[in-house]
Structures are given as structure tokens and as C-alpha cells.
Amino acid sequence: MVSRFLLTEYRNLTENPSEHFKVSVNENNLTEWDVILKGPSDTFYEGGLFKAKITFPPNYPYEPPKLTFTSEMWHPNIYPDGRLCISILHTDNVEERGMTWSPAQKIETVLLSVISLFNEPNTDSPANVDAAKSYRKLMHKEDLESYPMEVKKTVKKSLDECSAEDIEYFKNAVFNVPAIPSDAYEDEHEDEEMEDGTYILTYDDEDEEEEDDEMDDE
């Protein structure tokens, strides 16, 4: 049963790729996925491509998967060994703030929640105490440099560890992004929204092709 659930979710994610993450599966073990999470814009993590592994239990989706970062991370809710502490991956038997796991959850929801956590950490029960202390000092304007500096180190290291293929994936691919507000691209990408709801993230060759298509239509 677990294979059927995972195959369906994996197919949905690959047929409708996200600009925020990339997933791939271990061909020899469907219960192990590799994922790359893109650091969200306008945060200290912007520009980073952070690698992680998702491990699914035998009774998934009734038990949550586990997500462990393989990239070096500096975040209050990520243990130094890469294990992630987030409410959505806990059952209701664990006292955690926020939404907990249910069999109705989708991996896409989990990954978007992780990305959201980058900029909204929970410092009440931190997994990385030093990162939490540094973040609190940042929030209280006691130290505006230490936390951003440590995060930027991980951003650079994540890119050094990424393949050129993965970097190009996030740079050049076409994605369906229905959840993004229509005005999210109004400055830099105002003219790049397509009729089917996709966005092209680089425009050199594509713009020329669109112009040629318009001329052909005329």
C-alpha cells in the first residue's frame, strides 16, 4: 500500500513541478526520496539550494515521514546532524506548536511548510540552541550580523555542493505556480506570466521564440 501512495504522490510532484523544490526517488527503494529545497526570496536563505532526504515508514501515510538535511544548515529547528523538528511531521501525541501530521497530508504541503519555517523559526523548543540564541539576538536587535552571516555560509556551501544540472533546473525550468499571487512578479517578471499559469524563470531564448510565434500567428 505504501508504494501505491508514494508512487501517486511522486508522479503528481514530477508532473507538476514546483519552483520551490525538486524531488527525486531512489530507484532501488521507493521509500527514500532526495529533495532540494530552494531558499525563499527576501530571506537570509535566498539563493541557497539545500539538500535533504525523506524517509517513509512502512505504514505511511498513517505515520509521518522523516526529513533530514544533508546540506549543512544553521536554523533553530534543525539539529546539527540535519534532523528537522517541525510540528507537521509529528503526531498529535507529541506536544508541538502548530499543525500536526494526519494521513491526509501531502508531501508538497510538508515541503512548503519546511520552506516557510526557514523565515519563521520556532525558538520555544529549539533543535539547535546556538542558532536559536543567535536568532533571538537578531530579533531583539542585539546582534544583527551573527545569524545572517552563519546562514549565508550555508547558502554558499549548498551551492558549492549542488550539481550544475540542479542549479540549471531552478534557473531555467518552467513551473506551474498557481499559489503565487498574480502581483508577485509585477516588477521584474510583469510580462512573463503565460496563459496556462506558468512562469518562465529565464527569458533569453524563450522571448525570441515567443516573438517568432506571434509573427507566425499574424
UniProtKB/Swiss-Prot annotation:
Biological-process GO terms, alphabetical: protein ubiquitination
Pathway: Protein modification; protein ubiquitination
Keyword terms: ATP-binding, Early protein, Host cytoplasm, Host nucleus, Late protein, Nucleotide-binding, Transferase, Ubl conjugation pathway
The keyword Chaperone is annotated on this UniProt entry: no
Active site residues according to the UniProt entry: 85
Keyword field contains Transferase: yes
GO cellular component, one term: host cell cytoplasm
Compartments it resides in: Host cytoplasm; Host nucleus
Summary of the function given for this chain in its UniProt record: Accepts ubiquitin from the E1 complex and catalyzes its covalent attachment to other proteins. Performs the second step in the ubiquitination reaction that targets specifically a protein for degradation via the proteasome. By controlling the ubiquitination status of specific host proteins, the virus may target them to degradation and thereby optimize the viral replication. May be implicated in the shutoff of protein synthesis through its interactions with components of the host translation machinery.
Protein name as it appears in the record: Ubiquitin-conjugating enzyme E2
Organism: African swine fever virus (isolate Pig/Kenya/KEN-50/1950) (ASFV)
